[in-house]
Amino acid sequence: MAIVTTDSGLQYEDIKPGTGAEATAGKQVSVHYTGWLQNKDGSAGTKFDSSKDRNDPFGFSLGGGQVIRGWDEGVQGMKVGGVRKLIIPASIGYGARGAGGVIPPNATLIFEVELLGV
């Protein structure tokens, strides 16, 4: 699959296209995800969170600002059953403040997101 780069700097790649309902703005979605800090060479580094490890899917209203902008943008257009890799620059991630002592300031993040339901 090809890596797509959006105007915001988000990069995404569909690892496995879904075949179910499409995630669009305003819909409640349920996902499994794993997040890593990106190493300087672009590879996935330290894993900082995973709903899969907890077996606890995460739900949110897409496009409503409940999550970082990179997620609101990157999950749109996915279809249920699909898996997408998101590379999220700090500008649409946690920015200069970082998050919770786990994500340092200005960190680029890598997420693997599986859309479970819409």
For the regions a language model picked out, list residue spans one by one.
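Cross-family detector of peptidyl-prolyl cis-trans isomerase
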Residues: M1-V118
